[in-house]
Amino acid sequence: MLTLDKFEEASKIVSEVTLETKLVYSDFLSEKCGNSVYLKPENMQLTGAYKVRGAYYKISTLTPEERKKGLITASAGNHAQGVAYAAKKFGVRATIVMPTTTPLIKVNRTKNLGAEVVLYGDVYDEACAKAYELAKEHGYTFIHPFDDLAVATGQGTIAMEIFKELPLVEYILVPIGGGGLATGVSTLAKLLNPKIKVIGVEPAGANCMQAVSYTHLTLPTTPYV
């Protein structure tokens, strides 16, 4: 369960490896929207994205035995670098399965952070299935990119920083991919201010979350030991 205590704990832990990115006022968007609009530049993190927050906090919650087994995940870029960087900080081995279509620059950046990279499949789902297979075969601990409460808690620390700078914030717009960031940010934001409005944003051509909201859907899962 995501609680305020957990988010406060996560904020302290992720601050060991992340920058507290400061809000940037956007003249253009503020004028266009008729409101004061601020941007939170998480691209300024050392790994280039917010994903390191969830990866680092998740790894911090693992037992020494789980870390010793080695970590594994699947990603085409940002989560890969987040896990690789976090694993290096904890001094543990990380294996990242990336689709063969991943840009070489992302593959090299992940390798440069100390992770072993396995290229497999044309799309993320194929790489993820391979990662689960390797986790089962070698006993690795799987770090899911978004479907994990500890990961979502780490990502949600962004909201803690937003409220610190802008305590009277009324709306937060958060991008939706897998949903980990949106889960963490919306949960913490509502804990801090139940009246706040959190709006998820996704591409019109890839509106998976919106599509699911119109129907009942059972998602397949890949079991592993």
Enumerate the language-model features and the residues they cover.
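PLP-dependent amino-acid enzyme catalytic core
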Residues: 1-217, 223
